[in-house]
Amino acid sequence: MTQNKIIVTIGRQFGSGGHEVGRRLASELGISFYDHEFVDMAVKKTGFHADYVKDNEEKAPDFVSGAMFSGMEMYQPSPYDRIQAEEYKLIRDIASKESCVIVGRAADYILSDQSHVSIFLFAPMEDRVKRKMALLKPEDAAKMTPAAMEKIVKQMDKQRKRYYEYYTDMKWGARDSYDLLINTSQSGIDGA
C-alpha cells in the first residue's frame, strides 16, 4: 500500500447526506468517489440485473431467504451474500490501488486491516425527513407526506443496521465502530 494514499469510508443514516458529503469530500481531496458505482460493478461480477442489485445490495438475508438458499446438505449463498461478496472484493481492490472515498457497504469493516478514516454521519429524524422530501421530484413530492417519508427513513435505517451488523458483528452507528461521528444537522453538508 502506498503511504500517501487517502482512504475515507462513510457510514450513514438514511437522509443524513452521506452521498453528497462523500462526493464533495472526494472532490475537495481530488480523489475517486464510490457509492452507486458499486451497483454497476456488482452487476458485471454477479450477472444479476441492475435493478435487482440496486434493490438488494446493502441488505442482509432474512430467515425466509436464508432458508430458501441453504439446503440440508450444502449451503448455497443467497443473492444478498453473492452481492456482498463481490462488493467486498471490489472495495478491497479499489482501496489497494487508489485514494478514494467509499460510501456505505460496511467499507469501514472491510478495510479494517488497512489505514483509513471511518466516518459515520447522522442527523435528527425531522431533518432527515426534510432532506429526503426536498430531494423528491415534484411529481413524487405531491404524493409523499412527511409521515410516509419518515416510515421510509426508518425502514432504510433498519435495513442498513441489519446489513452492517449481519456482515460485521459490530454495532452500526456506535462510537466505537468509527473514527469520527458527524451530526450533519449541526455541521451542515458543507461543514461535514
Per-segment meaning from a language model:
Residues 113-133, 142-155:
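Conserved phosphate-donor/acceptor-positioning beta-strand/loop module used by diverse small-molecule
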Residues 32-44:
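Short beta-strand-centered segment that lines the nucleotide-binding/catalytic pocket of NTP-utilizing
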Residues 107-109, 123-128, 186-188:
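Conserved nucleotide-binding/hydrolysis micro-motifs of P-loop NTPases
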Residues 3-12, 98:
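Pre-Walker A (Motif I) flank of P-loop NTPase domains
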Residues 63-67, 141-190:
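Small-molecule kinase domains that catalyze NTP-dependent phosphoryl transfer to phosphate-bearing small molecules
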Residues 43-99:
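ATP-dependent small-molecule kinase phosphotransfer cores
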Residues 10-26:
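Glycine-rich phosphate-binding P-loop
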